[in-house]
Amino acid sequence: MSATPQPAQLEITGFNWVPDFAKGFVRDLRPRWACEEIGLPYSMRLLNAAAPRPEAYYKEQPWGQVPALVDQDSGLTIFESGAILLHIGEKDERLLPRDPQGRATAISWLFAAYNSVEPMAFELGNIEIFAAGEQWAELRRPSLIEFTCKRLDRLAIAIDGREWLAGQFSIADIAMATVLRDIEGSGLLEERPVLMAYLERAISRPAFKAALAAQLADFRPSPAAAA
């Protein structure tokens, strides 16, 4: 069920334009994917990434980023994609197991994706995209790669023999797969077949494909067109 302009239970914020390298990777993809997995209707409120945010938006998201979520049923406003995934997961056991250990495992891996893996992926993207060619980035890269490889090796050991992190597919896999996509093509995943196979399982799901297509369809061709 793709995003719809009609009123829906959840409203998610996103951008109506980003540079080409960011298309398909903006973090509103995460709650979109979760909604698609369980057929939960959602609508999008698109912001112009090339313009200053409306001042009122900082009350929803203190840094003016996306996504933020408004749950029309409860009236709750939530920011940070991990918190949003947890909120959506609470609505349906297909995304968050109801048995205590399954729930604890899924939540642990949700936090692990964003606290133990994403910081390295984010920094790697920073030095290779935004600081490419700068001396400090070249000096930082070897130690960053070494540390990232250690994290990925431990992740591969943890995933080996499992289909999904918490037994069943869950919000933990949405979190981890979207983080791993950020370093796909760097060679770091390709050197670890267990992680590549895990990522391919995740992004081959129809719900991911629907969420990705919906996000890409929302982008205007240029900042001027998004104004």
Describe these PLM feature segments.
Residues 1-139:
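GST-like domain detector, emphasizing the conserved glutathione-binding G-site
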Residues 48, 171, 215-216:
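Short, solvent-exposed turn/loop segments enriched in Gly/Ser/Thr/Pro and often Arg
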Residues 52-55, 201, 219-221:
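Short secondary-structure boundary/hinge segments and terminal tails
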Residues 89, 179-180, 212:
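Active-site-flanking alpha-helical
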Residues 113-204, 227:
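GST-like fold's C-terminal all-alpha helical module
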Residues 213-227:
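Terminal-tail/helix-coil boundary detector
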